[in-house]
Every structure is written in structure tokens, then in C-alpha cells.
């Protein structure tokens, strides 16, 4: 009877261990997904800053020419 109880308890321990491993896997997956999301936001922000800086510098360079045309 003790051997049967030992096997049943080991089965529950294994099931609980698998449950914890799956929870940890889900948390790791969500953390990676969040990291990619933040990296994408940062990339878009940097692209906007660079593009706006380039457009501002170009308009500053060509402003006398534009004022002659206008």
C-alpha cells in the first residue's frame, strides 16, 4: 500500500512541477513579447526624431531660396 501511495504522490508532484514549468514558460514568453513591443516603440520614436530633424535642417538650409521664390 505504501508503494501505491508513493506512486500517486509522485504523480501529483510531477503534475504540479509541469504546471509550474508551463506558468514560467508563459511568463517568459510574455516578457519577450513585451520587450519586442517596447523595442518597436523605441525604434519608431527614434525614426520620428531623426526624420523630423532631417526635415527641419533641410527646410532651414533652403529657407532663403524658398523666400526668393515666394
Swiss-Prot record:
Residue ranges for the region (Endoplasmic reticulum retention signal) are: 2-15
- Topological domains annotated Intravirion: 47-70
Q: Which Pfam families match?
A: PRRSV_2b
**Membrane topology summary:** Single-pass type I membrane protein
Q: Which keywords label this protein?
A: Glycoprotein, Host endoplasmic reticulum, Host Golgi apparatus, Host membrane, Ion channel, Ion transport, Lipoprotein, Membrane, Myristate, Secreted, Transmembrane, Transmembrane helix, Transport, Viral envelope protein, Viral ion channel, Virion
Q: Record's InterPro entries?
A: GP2b (IPR009775)
Q: Virion surface topology: which positions?
A: 2-25
The domain of life is Viruses
GO MF annotation: an example: channel activity
Taken from the UniProt entry, a GO cellular component term is: virion membrane
User: Which chain positions have N-myristoyl glycine-type lipid attachment?
Assistant: 2
Return one Gene Ontology term, BP aspect. Answer: monoatomic ion transmembrane transport
The UniProt similarity line reads: Belongs to the arteriviridae E protein family.
Q: How does it assemble?
A: Homooligomer. Associates with itself into higher-order structures, including dimers, trimers and tetramers. Associates with the GP2b-GP3-GP4 complex.
Q: What does this protein do?
A: Minor envelope protein. May function as a viroporin in the virion envelope that facilitates uncoating of the virus in order to release the genomic RNA into the cytoplasm for subsequent replication.
Report the protein name in the record.
Envelope small membrane protein
Species lineage:
Viruses, Riboviria, Orthornavirae, Pisuviricota, Pisoniviricetes
